[in-house]
Amino acid sequence: MNKFLIIDGLNLVRRIYAAIPDETDMQSLTERVISACTKLLRVHRPTHVAIVWDGHEISWRKQLYPDYKKGRKPMPEPLAQGLVALQDHLTAMHIGSIYAAAEADDVIATLAIKTAKAQGEAIIVSTDKGFSQLNHRHISQWDHFNQQYLDIAALEQKLGVERSQFLDLMALAGDSGNKIPGIAGIGPKSAAELLKTFRSLPTLFSSLSNLGAKQAKKLAEGKEMARLSYKLAQLQTDLPLNINLKDFRVIDSPPEKTINQD
């Protein structure tokens, strides 16, 4: 069975970069990133590995909602200048790069879903909990910095909803980290309570007459914003990917069946 290790490039690199005392010390960054990737390969023993990078185009989410991710700090200049050399070092390690047009997240999600549907195993290396919406038994998420898999049961308990409701929760309450708005006046706790009762957004919005007047008014006025927020939060899993899986085979990995990436 194919085991595809899919690394969220900037999520890994920027976390490592933030811990380096001298922000111009690209040598230390390169050494630490290579060490991290070597450990990832040793721990997970994948048949295939790729590191996915964000691109420079304006994302479709930003075009749809200009405030999306507003206020995010730009990449530090030393890192921006040293990134190509770092990517070259990873290529020399036989860790191939995939370059997204805009956000890496949708490419990572597409790779994971395609792998899982082909009866392979996908391991996403990222601390971004947005990947938790990829509800498939052959997809897992690894936090390199805490050396553990994302605990979905613990996340469900923390958020107060089931995994199948994560997107509905973000549609109602928003996501401050990504500047996804949600509905004004609806916070995470009240959103979770609503989803416990009504289970899904369609059922909730068809049941406003069962709520108090004030809350029903908020929801009715925010319905379109909830739909927008859902769309912003939802990962695309069907992007056309012009890649060949054999290019990402781990050296010395035994032959496995390929997956269709069309």
From Swiss-Prot:
Its EC number is 3.1.-.-. Its cofactor is Mg(2+); K(+). It holds the Pfam family 5_3_exonuc. SUPFAM superfamilies: 5' to 3' exonuclease, C-terminal subdomain, PIN domain-like. Keywords: DNA-binding, Endonuclease, Hydrolase, Magnesium, Metal-binding, Nuclease, Potassium. Binds 2 Mg(2+) per subunit. Only one magnesium ion has a direct interaction with the protein, the other interactions are indirect. CDD domains: H3TH_53EXO (cd09898), PIN_53EXO (cd09859). Mg(2+) binds at D105. GO terms for biological process: DNA replication, Okazaki fragment processing. InterPro entries: 5-3_exonucl_a-hlix_arch_N, 5-3_exonuclease, 5-3_exonuclease_C_sf, DNA_polI_H3TH, FEN, HhH2, PIN-like_dom_sf, Xni. It is an enzyme of class 3 (hydrolase). Gene3D superfamilies: 5' to 3' exonuclease, C-terminal subdomain, 5'-nuclease. K(+) binds at L172, A173, P181, I183, I186. Residues 162-257 form the 5'-3' exonuclease domain. GO terms for molecular function: 5'-3' exonuclease activity; 5'-flap endonuclease activity; DNA binding; magnesium ion binding; potassium ion binding. Belongs to the Xni family. NCBIfam families: PRK09482.1 (NF007017). Has flap endonuclease activity. During DNA replication, flap endonucleases cleave the 5'-overhanging flap structure that is generated by displacement synthesis when DNA polymerase encounters the 5'-end of a downstream Okazaki fragment. This is Flap endonuclease Xni. The lineage of its organism: Bacteria, Pseudomonadati, Pseudomonadota, Gammaproteobacteria, Alteromonadales. The gene is xni.
